[in-house]
C-alpha cells in the first residue's frame, strides 16, 4: 500500500506544489518515515502531527538511518544538515515544517489545519475551511469542515490520492 500511496502523491502533486499532510505519516519504523519522504517528488511538505506520528511528536528529531553512508542533504530544501554522518536530525530536515495545528490562508480563505476534526475553529462563522484527517471518511462534510485523508478520497473519488485545492473549494462552497 505504501508504494501505491507514493505513486498517487507523485501523480497528483507536482515537484513545485505544496503538500499539507494532515497526520499519520508513518505507522511503522524510523526507516519508513525516511523512505516514504525520500520517494516523494514534492519539495515542500508541511506535516500536521497525527495520532500515529508518535516518534516525530515525542522527539521532533529522528535517528539518521543513513548515517553509515554519505547522506547529508536536507530532503525539504536540499541544504546540508550539518556534518556528513549525524546521528540525529531534526524532523524539519524531512519536512518544510512540523505542527500540531496550523492556520494558512489560500485564495483569501483562512484554512485551519489539524489532524483531528473540530466542532469550532478559527473564523468558523466567517468562511474558514477546516481541513482534517483522522476519521477515515466516517464524518460527512459539514459546513466548512472536510476530512482530506486519502481514505476519504477513496470514498469520494474511488482512488487513494490527495485532494486538490480546487476540489476542496468546490465541495465546501456547495455547503454554504
Residue ranges and their predicted role:
Residues 64-176:
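Conserved beta-sheet core of the metallophosphoesterase superfamily
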Residues 1-101:
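Core catalytic region of metal-dependent phosphoesterases/phosphodiesterases
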Amino acid at each position: 500500500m505504501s508504494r501505491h500511496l507514493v505513486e498517487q502523491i507523485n501523480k497528483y502533486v507536482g515537484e513545485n506544489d505544496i503538500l499539507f499532510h494532515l497526520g499519520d505519516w508513518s505507522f511503522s519504523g524510523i526507516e519508513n518515515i525516511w523512505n516514504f519522504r525520500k520517494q516523494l517528488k514534492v519539495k515542500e511538505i508541511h506535516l500536521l502531527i497525527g495520532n500515529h506520528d508518535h516518534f516525530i511528536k515525542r522527539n521532533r528529531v529522528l535517528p539518521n538511518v543513513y548515517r553509515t553512508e554519505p547522506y547529508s542533504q536536507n530532503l525539504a530544501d536540499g541544504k546540508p544538515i550539518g556534518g556528513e554522518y549525524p546521528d540525529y536530525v531534526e524532523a524539519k530536515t524531512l519536512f518544510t515544517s512540523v505542527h500540531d495545528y496550523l492556520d494558512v490562508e489560500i485564495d483569501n480563505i483562512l484554512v485551519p489545519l489539524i489532524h483531528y476534526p473540530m466542532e469550532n475553529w478559527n473564523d468558523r462563522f466567517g468562511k474558514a475551511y477546516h481541513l482534517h484527517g483522522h476519521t477515515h471518511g466516517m464524518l460527512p462534510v459539514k459546513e466548512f469542515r472536510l476530512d482530506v485523508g486519502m481514505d476519504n478520497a477513496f470514498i469520494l473519488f474511488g482512488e487513494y490520492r490527495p485532494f486538490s485545492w480546487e476540489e476542496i473549494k468546490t465541495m465546501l462552497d456547495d455547503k454554504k
